[in-house]
Amino acid sequence: MKSKALIVLGIALCLLAVSASIFAHHGAAAYDMTKTVTIKGKVTHFNFVNPHVQVFFAVTGDKGPEPWQAELTSPNHLVRTGWSKDTLKSGDDVTITGYRTKDGTNSIWIAKILLKDQELILATE
């Protein structure tokens, strides 16, 4: 009976550990959600994949193009608003408004995106 209790306890602890990491992944802790920034750039790559769609783009800075990365919600959410793997293409000019990472790296969580001055509708989680 004692060994069954230990097995159940072990399984419960494993499930607890896994669920904590899942919730941590979906948090916005890395982003400063108190300040929005707007950045203009040119799409270099568009990953329409789970768990989050990614947009890689170049921003022209004082020292030439700087690589940036932006995240969106899941493809499933975006499909519901008309997005597809072809919504953004390499070379597209975009204006992205969102929340930059707290550590200052060139990464942003997208709140709004303009493609050729047309706002793309985003699905929220």
Protein language model features and the residues they cover:
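Bacterial N-terminal signal peptides that target proteins for export
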Residues: 1-10
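Conserved hydrophobic positions within beta-strands
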Residues: 41-43
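Short nucleic-acid-contacting surface segments enriched for D/E, G, S/T with interspersed K/R
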Residues: 80-95
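Short aromatic-glycine-enriched beta-strand elements
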Residues: 49-59
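OB-fold/S1-family single-stranded nucleic acid-binding modules
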Residues: 101-124
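Cleavable N-terminal signal peptides
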Residues: 11-12, 22
